Curated annotation (Swiss-Prot):
Heterodimer of a 45 kDa (A23R) and a 32 kDa (A8R) subunit to form the virus intermediate transcription factor (VITF)-3. Keywords: Activator, Early protein, Transcription, Transcription regulation. The keyword Phosphoprotein does not apply. Acts with RNA polymerase to initiate transcription from intermediate gene promoters. It comes from Variola virus (isolate Human/India/Ind3/1967). It comes from the Viruses. Induction: Expressed in the early phase of the viral replicative cycle. Belongs to the orthopoxvirus OPG134 family. This is Intermediate transcription factor 3 small subunit.
Length: 288
């Protein structure tokens, strides 16, 4: 019934040469973060399936979560499959639910940690989809208690650090009992350091709560980390006079140094990991 058109009935053979991947160069402004132009990552799936697939895409960066915790987060996302949260930006709902769920277990991320593990959330500049706006919207939609994600409560941020340096044999989801003394010690140092800055009028009040917390936590983490490296190198000890009630567990930090280094290196890759020399010098006065 139909006859082939000669001009279109063509065959071609394509020969591919050798390509050396090591010699390729990235494009200008190319970055490792993924930003969906259409806000739909898996448009051919239902929004529920899309959230789960998006969660798998994002959670692979949280390398310190074990399989039980990942399974728990998937169940939390599955529990709200019938809830319409956003009309367009469906793919970022999953990581926000994960962040709020982890926060409900006592672990929060500073701005630098968010940039390190969820750069898409940190780099969102539109007012509608900014981090704090999305947190408020999702809290309201899911019936969570409304409130700011970043508050002057330092334990949750150091609990995330504890998650990252956990012993492989820890039992239970988000269990940091073995590292609880480290959380208490780092938190006490940060609270006292924050009060010192308040008394000296060194806190930048124009900055957001998240930015102030980020600066405090980053300063304490990098100072403790660098002192730890000197201790390991020289086989010595150090103490911090700000840790009055909970002394720093140096042995624990030495034992987990490899994991601690991996976590610190992830933070150092971010643009928000900026340490004030003045703050660091002030804090170092309390280390001997």
């Amino acid at each position: 019934m139909f006859e082939p058109v000669p001009d279109l009935n063509l065959e071609a053979s394509v020969e591919l040469g050798e390509v050396n991947i090591d010699q390729t160069t990235p494009m200008i402004k190319e970055n490792i973060g993924f930003i969906s132009r259409s806000r739909r990552l898996f448009a051919h799936r239902s929004k529920d399936d899309e959230r789960k697939l998006a969660l798998r895409f994002f959670l692979q960066r949280l390398y310190f979560l074990d399989h039980r915790e990942i399974h728990y987060l998937f169940r939390c996302v599955d529990a709200v499959k019938d809830v319409t949260i956003t009309k367009k930006n469906n793919i970022i709902v999953a990581p926000y639910i994960a962040l709020l769920t982890i926060a409900s277990k006592g672990c929060k991320l500073t701005e630098t940690m968010i940039e390190a593990f969820f750069p898409e959330l940190y780099n969102e500049h539109s007012k509608k989809f900014k981090f704090n706006s999305q947190v408020s919207i999702i809290q309201e939609k899911l019936g969570y208690q409304s409130g700011n994600y970043h508050v002057y409560d330092f334990e949750p941020y150091y609990s995330t650090v504890a998650l990252a340096i956990r012993d492989e044999h820890s039992s239970g989801i988000f269990n940091i009992r073995q590292e609880s003394y480290l959380v208490s010690s780092l938190s006490e140092i940060t609270y006292r350091f924050y009060l010192i800055n308040l008394k000296s009028d060194l806190v930048q009040w124009s900055a957001s709560t998240g930015a102030v917390i980020n600066q405090m936590v980053n300063t304490v983490l990098i100072t403790v980390y660098e002192k730890l490296q000197l201790v390991i190198e020289n086989d010595s000890q150090f103490i911090c006079s700000l840790a009055v009630e909970s002394e720093l567990p140096i042995k624990l930090l030495k034992d987990r140094n490899e994991l601690f280094t991996k976590f610190i290196n992830e933070l150092k890759k971010t643009s928000s990991f900026k340490i004030s020399k003045r703050d660091k010098d002030t804090l170092l006065k309390y280390f001997t």
